[in-house]
Amino acid sequence: MNKENHSLIAEFILTGFTYHPKLKTVLFVVFFAIYLITMVGNIGLVALIYIEQRLHTPMYIFLGNLVLMDSCCSSAITPKMLENFFSEDKRITLYECMAQFYFLCLAETTDCFLLAAMAYDCYVAICNPLQYHTMMSKTLCIQMTAGAYLAGNLHPMIEVEFLLRLTFCGSHQINHFFCDVLPLYRLSCINPYINELVLFILAGSIQIFTIVLVSYFYILFTIFTMKSKEGRGKALSTCASHFLSVSIFCDSLLFMYARPGAVNEGDKDIPVAIFYTLVIPLLNPFIYSLRNKEVINIMKKIMKKRKFCHILKQMSSPLAT
């Protein structure tokens, strides 16, 4: 009973990156800039997809939800991390810790299923272009998006339930910049073997599902059997950004959680954690936008309209006086 009470009132200390004053300032500026660019890029892309009627297609609906989840991932971690750079009180309660991990896990798992939906969309567009509108209807698109969020919620609920069964003791210092499961397992007074097994099974199965090997095989096979070089190039450019995003995201998560012995490696997983929680959400809007002619053309038109409106205002202001 004492152990249970102890675990319920537990507080942790997030040690973060470093206590060196000069390095702390540099890191704060770097991570604040990353967070700012991430939020502007992701929310800007969501707004563009929402406003522009031409982007109301399955691919962009999935993309809009993907970058929205990237914003959620970044917002779950970065504000607390930035606060801890200069705050003397680096404590975080057990429930705050669980909430932080829940929203991170929700965002990452939903991302996995959204990437899988985008893989299917890419497969239909390349392999069955004539049946695209039949196979990728709006109803199916909404169902797949809703399914991604439902599945995304299920995974963190299971993980948090198993985490709350653990009893934490010792220094309560989490040698990390956020509440991740692996550092929490290291602080457990009891053997977290069951938790590790559940994490390995869930993380492994989600990644295998997400990669959608069969879809990629058919996509690549169809592309390389195309007779037209122009058609092959167009097909590759359509799915290249998705291939890049999936490979970076899935490889980092598999390396982080699905490899044996990950719990016993101490703070060696921090660089990988920085990459998939902060860098990938920063890169995604640029990966999908800069390689997409449709998005670039729409952005150019919006910029031209803004310039035109600004010129009209300048011309009308002398007339008004």
Curated annotation (Swiss-Prot):
Presence of keyword Membrane: yes
Domain of life: Eukaryota
InterPro entries registered for this protein in UniProt: GPCR_Rhodpsn (IPR000276), GPCR_Rhodpsn_7TM (IPR017452), Olfact_rcpt (IPR000725)
Gene3D superfamilies: Rhodopsin 7-helix transmembrane proteins
Glycosylation (residues): 5
Family membership: Belongs to the G-protein coupled receptor 1 family.
Highest classification ranks of the organism: Eukaryota, Metazoa, Chordata, Craniata, Vertebrata
Protein name: Olfactory receptor 5K3
Job of this protein: Odorant receptor.
